[in-house]
Amino acid sequence: MSQRAKQIKKQTLAGSPYDTGYEHGKLAEVQIKNSLQTYEKMFREYAETSWDEACDQALLHVNYVKEHYPSFLEEMKAIAIGAKVEFEDILVLNCRSEIALTSPDGCSSFALTQPKTEKTWLAQNWDWKREQVNSILHLELVQDNLPTIQMITEAGIIGKIGYNSHGIGVCLNALRTNQWQAKLPIHLGLRAILESHTFEEAISRIDQNQIASAAHFLIASKSKDIISVEVSPVYTEKILPKHGSLQHTNHICSSKMKKTMDEFAKPDSFDRLCILSDLIDSQIDKSINHEFLFQLLANHDNYPNSICRHHNPALSEQEQTETVFSIAMNLNDAGFYWFLGKPCQYF
């Protein structure tokens, strides 16, 4: 590691959904308002959607969430109170993937387990709007009768990338399609996974077309299980590991799923997946550690649209995405490693 990685202090939130939500909103008021500014601009310029229209669309999900996960609504309402904003504002943040269905999210993720490696690992670069580097939080949620969650998230969003005290972890890849229904938003699906006690329970939360729009969830467990799940409101496909590894970027891999929807994948997603697959096949051995995984995530092949993603002057402002944070998780030993910015800054 060439220099000290930039991180953010972990914030531990404990208690009821209201308690954790209120503290989240209170401690992250500035970061939440930065998120609101980022997405107001993005919806207006990229999706031609006003904030009022975004609120109306987000509200379409309330009935489904209320029926299946009422505690999520309680937590979001409390975040709004703590941050001195409206409930609809926080709801929009948690539905932001559904409001801009073809927004240019990027991400490269992979999972490793036996026989490829001794330990079970999850790792990814999260590529998004550079403004959101100022909204990133490291949260630990301690809840009654539920696993303790540790995750890296955008301020105001209650589900993101992380793991829990039962050894269940999840990474996320956006998929650009035309599919949407008023079901469980992607980020709330991530939270549902993180509240699971077992690998099987985690899969059951998202594998029956419960999710409102298309995405890829990469799930791993300290039981040494890993699985890719490409989800949507109309079709869901589970992809099993080959020789102890799985990798994904931002296009649909299931041939059956491709037939059920229109997809708007970018060419660099296919390039990144090929590069990532080759790196894993050629360089991974059983005794790897998190620093080695970050070296893979620092790869610059096909720069600037590389695994470690940089500003691309050939793209419009609306299309720009960069690596905002990198994360590696050891599910067996509860190792949680991450930092802000691009991994090439440190490896």
Can you say where each PLM-predicted feature lies in the sequence?
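Solvent-exposed, amphipathic alpha-helical segments
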Residues: 189-192, 279
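C-terminus-biased signal that marks the final domain/tail of proteins
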Residues: 1-105, 115, 196-236, 244-347
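Cysteine-dependent hydrolase recognition
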Residues: 168, 192-193
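Short, charged, low-complexity patches
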Residues: 179-187, 195, 199, 269
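Short, charged/polar low-complexity linear motifs in solvent-exposed/disordered segments
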Residues: 138-141, 188-190, 219, 245-246
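Internal mixed beta-strand/loop scaffold within catalytic domains of large alpha/beta enzymes
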Residues: 95-187, 324, 336-339, 345-346
